[in-house]
Design a protein with these regions (language model features):
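The conserved acidic donor/metal-binding loop of glycosyltransferases
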Residues: 106-110
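Conserved donor-nucleotide/metal-binding helix-loop-beta segment in metal-dependent transferases, i.e.
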Residues: 113-140
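Short, acidic, metal-binding catalytic loop of nucleotide-sugar glycosyltransferases
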Residues: 24-32
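A glycosyltransferase accessory/donor-loop signature
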Residues: 1-4, 10, 17, 166-323
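Short aromatic/hydrophobic "clamp" motif used to bind/position activated sugar donors
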Residues: 102
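Acidic donor-binding segment of Leloir-type glycosyltransferases
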Residues: 36, 41-65
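Conserved small/polar residues in nucleotide/adenosyl-binding loops
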Residues: 324-329
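Active-site-proximal specificity loops/subdomain of glycosyltransferases
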Residues: 59-92
């Protein structure tokens, strides 16, 4: 039996989400000898640290807290951290992880089955493994990737720490950030996909079941995001029916940590939340932006072909605006 080594990154705002994710992982992974968790934090309170420590110790696991600023000194002032400091934490894991590999998890995840098969993925010759993401083609172009290049979602990553150390991947991350003056599409995710190009292994989409899977078919995903290759409908349907890792990404559903979420797995989050030390604090109401509501309603009302035309016109206008702004500058 092995030790499952994992990492989360959080600040005080997301501590309760980390607790729920970690609880779900511990509940579904008794087949591991133990679980060791690295928590990279940005001013996480002692109270929240105690809650997480008590949780993992109740399963005979181990936990280690690392302050983000203590490992990210190489960035200097190269980043503005628009998504918050801790979203960049995964870039620095090789500094702190003693093991040869680690599973990084975003805090907006729930683990629903054993991760044994994922953990045993062969990473020889690869820096990283993950699930192919759903992104606009312009975002790949922005980080100097071709449309055919693999681009994964960085919310769930199986990382070959041994290779990161050997090839000084952290230094490459920092060099790319500075080269781009900190302005990189999708921030840390864009950095990872650029630097790890040609060394990325794709895995089953059951290990990162994202929100769009619940309302878009494989063909619609490929058409909307101009993807040549993606998971097929059988793979996606199997993933949403029997997810190993749920990832509550942005989309047409209000996020599950809001009381009015209609995400198909909102009930599962509430189950773990009601077991947490925060259970007496009611979940707040959430809201979708007007832009998302409009796009969702257009998709529901109009034929898909018309929706696609509207979307492409919108993208072309955005490109023109960008070009005009660049020329004016």
């Amino acid at each position: 039996m092995e030790t499952l080594t994992i990492a989360y990154a959080t600040d005080e705002n997301y501590a309760k989400l980390v607790w729920c994710s970690l609880k779900s992982l511990l509940e579904n992974n008794a087949n591991f000898f133990t679980v060791k968790a690295y928590i990279i934090s940005d001013n996480l309170s002692n109270s929240s640290k105690d809650k997480l420590s008590n949780l993992i110790s109740s399963y005979n696991g181990k936990i280690c807290f690392i302050e983000f600023d203590s490992i990210a000194y190489g960035l200097d002032n190269a980043c503005t951290f628009q998504n918050g400091k801790t979203s960049y934490a995964r870039l620095f894991l090789a500094q702190i992880v003693k093991e040869n590999k680690i599973l990084y998890l975003d805090c907006d995840t729930l683990i629903n089955h054993s991760l044994c098969d994922l953990w045993n993925t062969d990473l020889e010759g690869y820096y990283i493994a993950g699930v192919k993401d759903i992104i606009a083609p312009q975002l790949k172009q922005d980080i100097q990737l071709l449309p055919t290049d693999i681009y994964i979602n960085a919310g769930i990553l199986l990382i070959n720490i041994q290779e990161w150390k050997k090839n000084k991947i952290e230094s490459q991350f920092i060099a790319y950030i500075k080269k781009m003056n900190g302005k990189i599409s999708c921030h840390d995710q864009g950095i990872i996909n650029h630097v790890c190009k040609n060394k990325i292994k794709t895995i089953s989409c059951t290990y990162n079941v994202m929100t769009p899977f619940f309302y878009l078919s494989s063909l619609q995903i490929k058409e909307i995001f101009e993807l040549k290759d993606y998971y097929n409908d059988i793979e996606i349907k199997e993933a949403i029916s029997h997810p190993h890792i749920l990832h509550f990404t942005a989309g047409w559903h209000i996020r599950v940590w809001y009381s009015n979420s209609k995400h198909p797995y909102a009930y599962l989050f509430k189950k773990y939340y009601n077991l947490s030390p925060w259970k007496k604090t009611p979940l707040p109401l959430g809201h979708l932006t007007l832009k998302i509501k409009v796009l969702r309603n257009i998709f529901k009302i109009l034929p898909f072909s018309i929706y696609l035309k509207i979307l492409r016109i919108k993208r072309e206008r955005a490109k023109c605006c960008l070009l005009y702004t660049s020329d004016a500058a």
